[in-house]
Amino acid sequence: MKSNKLTFMPALLSSLMLVSSCYASGDIGSNIIGQWIVENVYVDGNDSSRPDFISNDPNLVGRVINFDKNSISGSILVANGCASPSYNKKDPITVAQLLNLTAGESENEKNDLANDYGLPLVAKNTVVPYEVNCKSGMFGPSGEKIGNWIVEKKDGELLTNWNSQSYLLLKRLPANVKPMPSFNCIKASTDTEKAICSNNELAGWDRSVAQAYSIAVKQIKSVDVDVKSKLSMLLVSQNNWIKKRNECKGDEKCLSEKMQNRVSELVEQSK
């Protein structure tokens, strides 16, 4: 497949998606079948209000979205996701126009939203959006003047709009990918570590906990007030949490809940 540098900007009308020009003449439903992982989260760098998501938010990065003929599913999708998705090709549009419509602006408003969000896209480039309609449920949130969309940045990478005026970069996962947590699985010794090393979802959440902890440390240092004591308190809190997590032993549901809650807690502390 020829690689196209296209634009991925979000919006969802009862679950819509937009895909890039390389899919313009193909069966997009077949081309995107498989597992995709959230690689990056983009938020408006000029927004001074308290955000729902932060840049590369650990709540979203690492989450897997499954596309198949009958559904679109994943832990970050609302309820049961999108049932019986269909893909409707839209007219070509520039990245700037697509982002303006998603934000509720006039299509030809002289904004530079691609730059404001730090998106890996060029505002003047043209993309071919595909709307994804769901027989029931939804994929992502609707934009202000356009539905949810997906476009191809390059082969194996998609961009789509998401909740709270954010955007997600999705990367295709190879078949039979091995779990890769934040620690070396060769050294896994406890039931908890072994469970994490045998499950891609748990391994992803383990990476997210590590990422969220790193963000919390950086935030404490950036504020530069009582840094030593706050870092000490954070470390104690993390060690206590690890003990609680290990009480789950190999219970996957318990581990998933513990890690999701910890990620949310650490991210909230960093806002």
Please describe what each predicted stretch is.
Residues S25-V64, S106-V177:
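Lipid interaction determinants
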Residues M1-L6:
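Positively charged n-region of N-terminal signal peptides that target proteins for export
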Residues V43-D44, F67-E144, S232-L235, K243-E247:
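Contiguous, well-ordered beta-strand patches that form the walls/edges
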Residues P10-V19:
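Bacterial N-terminal signal peptides
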